[in-house]
């Protein structure tokens, strides 16, 4: 019998989790994987396109090429290119002989508009970083620590029960004390459960998360409006008529009224416009999916931790509307599942609990580890019958 008890003690000692208090803060993920992907794309993609636009401008020189008159010198031709790029306006003569002016400034503003887009898309990230991350990190550290500690306390409790059973000469006394302790809820540690229930009444994290994604949708909509209103109007215009008869050149008769110019960077402009629409169109469903995850609970994660004493948010139906801070915390617990050492142990115990023939006697990890340690989780039937015979 002593050998069996020694084996049980070793098994329970191995089931205890190591203390990793010092290194946990560095390993915490304070952004969900999809949010991180959205951040890299929404901020990094405009910067990539901006680099492409600047690289094309530096490699090919002037972004326009004007067809100056043949009697113009090289310096005059360079002046025409520079003047037409500065004005970047298309002059078109209508039926009445009047000139209408159409600005082509989106071509000139392309790299800077991409930079402004990247800065705007980074604002929701800054909002989350400074408004939510400090509170979220402290919540996660406390909850992860308490979940693992609750698991360890359960194992230590089984170790203590095993020692009491070894020292007790009368099994009736041991089981009577055990039943009394169960009825008086000595085995439960309700601090964590109450803290999580309190988080259901808090809405700071969920409001910040909703605002972050709402801003992303707003800036994406503004990008669509900008591209549709300004880029689409000049999307196919490769050539334009430029007028340089301004200032001192206004009275010069040898200077033509209009000079035809060609946009050499039109292909880059079109690539940037089309790729921006395509990328942000793909990202919109991802952002909406991130928002819809707040409308349902991660019940699988909760059901596994139901094996801890006093962690019965599901069984007691304490979960209400999922749009609160607790649901956000559960999403980040799932993202930081590698930091929850107790999760793998409890997952295994849940599988074993579902397959055991005595599952009607097993509710918590204390019950199951008691069974694995060689003790029955409830008073044996022969002892119950013996007690009934003594006290009919």
Swiss-Prot record:
Q: Which UniProt keywords apply?
A: Cell junction, Cell membrane, Endoplasmic reticulum, Gap junction, Glycoprotein, Ion channel, Ion transport, Membrane, Transmembrane, Transmembrane helix, Transport
- Entry protein name: Pannexin-3
Question: Is Nucleotidyltransferase a UniProt keyword of this protein?
Answer: no
Q: Where in the cell is it found?
A: Cell membrane; Cell junction, Gap junction; Endoplasmic reticulum membrane
State which ranges are Extracellular (membrane side).
Answer: 61-113, 237-267
What does this protein do, in the record's words?
Regulator of osteoblast differentiation by functionning as a Ca(2+) channel in the endoplasmic reticulum which regulates calmodulin (CaM) pathways. Allows ATP release into the extracellular space and activation or purinergic receptors.
Q: Which residues lie on this side of the membrane: Cytoplasmic?
A: 1-39, 135-215, 289-392
GO-annotated molecular function: calcium channel activity; gap junction hemi-channel activity; structural molecule activity; wide pore channel activity
Q: How does it sit in the membrane?
A: Multi-pass membrane protein
- Name a single GO cellular component: gap junction
What reaction is this protein's catalytic activity?
Ca(2+)(in) = Ca(2+)(out); ATP(in) = ATP(out)
| Superkingdom of origin | Eukaryota
| Example GO biological process | positive regulation of interleukin-1 production
Per the record, the similarity remark reads: Belongs to the pannexin family.
A Pfam family it matches: Innexin
Describe its assembly.
Homoheptameric.
């Amino acid at each position: 019998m002593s050998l069996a008890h020694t084996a049980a003690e070793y098994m329970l000692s191995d089931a205890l989790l190591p203390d990793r208090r010092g290194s946990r803060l560095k390993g915490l993920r304070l952004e969900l994987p999809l949010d991180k992907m959205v951040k890299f794309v929404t901020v990094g993609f405009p910067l990539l396109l901006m680099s492409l636009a600047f690289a094309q401008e530096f490699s090919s020189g002037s972004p326009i090429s004007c067809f100056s008159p043949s009697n113009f010198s090289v310096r005059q031709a360079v002046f025409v290119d520079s003047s037409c790029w500065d004005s970047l306006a298309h002059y078109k003569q209508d039926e009445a002989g009047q000139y209408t002016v159409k600005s082509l400034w989106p071509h000139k503003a392309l790299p800077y508009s991409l930079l402004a887009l990247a800065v705007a898309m980074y604002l929701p990230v800054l909002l989350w970083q400074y408004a939510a991350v400090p509170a979220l990190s402290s919540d996660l550290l406390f909850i992860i620590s308490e979940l693992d500690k609750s698991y360890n306390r359960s194992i230590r409790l089984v170790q203590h029960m095993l020692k009491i059973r070894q020292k007790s000469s009368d099994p009736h006394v041991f089981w009577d004390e055990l039943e009394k302790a169960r009825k008086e809820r000595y085995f439960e540690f309700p601090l964590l459960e109450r803290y999580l229930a309190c988080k259901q009444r808090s809405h700071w994290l969920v409001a910040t998360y909703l605002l972050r994604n709402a801003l992303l949708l707003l800036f994406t909509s503004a990008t669509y409006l900008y591209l549709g209103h300004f880029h689409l109007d000049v999307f196919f215009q490769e050539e334009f008529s430029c007028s340089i008869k301004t200032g001192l050149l206004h009275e010069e008769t040898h200077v033509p009224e209009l000079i035809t110019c060609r946009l050499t960077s039109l292909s880059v402009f079109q690539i940037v416009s089309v790729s921006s629409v395509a990328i942000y169109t793909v990202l919109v469903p991802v952002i909406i999916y991130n928002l819809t995850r707040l409308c349902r609970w991660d019940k699988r994660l909760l059901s596994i931790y139901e094996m801890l004493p006093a962690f019965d948010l599901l069984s007691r139906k304490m979960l209400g509307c999922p749009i609160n801070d607790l649901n956000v915390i559960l999403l980040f617990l799932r993202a930081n599942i590698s930091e929850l050492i107790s999760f793998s142990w409890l997952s295994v115990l849940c599988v074993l609990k579902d397959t055991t023939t005595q599952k009607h006697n097993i509710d918590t990890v204390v019950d199951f580890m008691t069974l694995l340690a060689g003790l029955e989780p409830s008073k044996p039937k022969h002892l119950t019958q013996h007690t009934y015979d003594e006290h009919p």
